């Protein structure tokens, strides 16, 4: 993992990959579902850094559940194009972690998509939120301390709106 503030890349690099042919949709670009898959693979990689592995699950009978996410699509990605995904922790506590990920074109360096996720640490025996084990909480703290000194991303916490709606549901 390295800090990636150079060349307009924000956050700590987590994974690299390339857009697979089966990820392409009828519009000849990466389908929305596969952006989520790529971000999920990045989360799995980050979790390994923290020690949240299959072994952790088996030994402690605990894991993480994603409880909220928000994806933004900025620019298209086409078949075989390389990407890199970075992570920036926005907040964490004894039971939760809130992170923001960015997908960049690995060569052209443009921002292709963002993902904001909230995860809970869960005791699988009772399926309830539970505190992080001390060793994992320490790894999360170390990552947070060593991450880029990035501002809160403009997409973080963003709500969806239509500026001049022809129709709007009551209460919006």
What spans do the regions from the language model cover?
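Local beta-strand/beta-hairpin segments that build beta-sheet-rich folds
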Residues: 14, 110-112
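Solvent-exposed strand-loop boundary residues in beta-sheet-rich modules
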Residues: 107-109, 125
């Amino acid at each position: 993992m390295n800090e990636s503030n150079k060349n307009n890349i924000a956050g700590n690099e987590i994974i690299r990959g390339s857009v697979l042919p089966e990820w392409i949709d009828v519009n000849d670009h990466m389908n929305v579902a596969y952006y989520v898959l790529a971000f999920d693979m990045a989360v799995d990689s980050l979790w390994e850094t923290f020690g949240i592995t299959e072994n952790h699950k088996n030994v402690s009978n605990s894991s993480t559940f994603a409880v909220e996410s928000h994806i933004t699509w900025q620019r298209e990605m086409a078949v075989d194009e390389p990407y890199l995904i970075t992570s920036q922790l926005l907040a964490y506590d004894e039971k939760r972690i809130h992170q923001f990920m960015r997908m960049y074109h690995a060569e052209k360096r443009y921002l292709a998509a963002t993902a904001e996720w909230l995860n809970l640490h869960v005791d699988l025996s009772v399926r309830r939120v539970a505190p992080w084990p001390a060793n994992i909480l320490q790894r999360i703290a170390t990552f947070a301390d060593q991450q880029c000194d990035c501002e809160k991303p403009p997409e973080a916490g963003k709500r969806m709106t239509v500026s001049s709606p022809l129709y709007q549901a009551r209460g919006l």
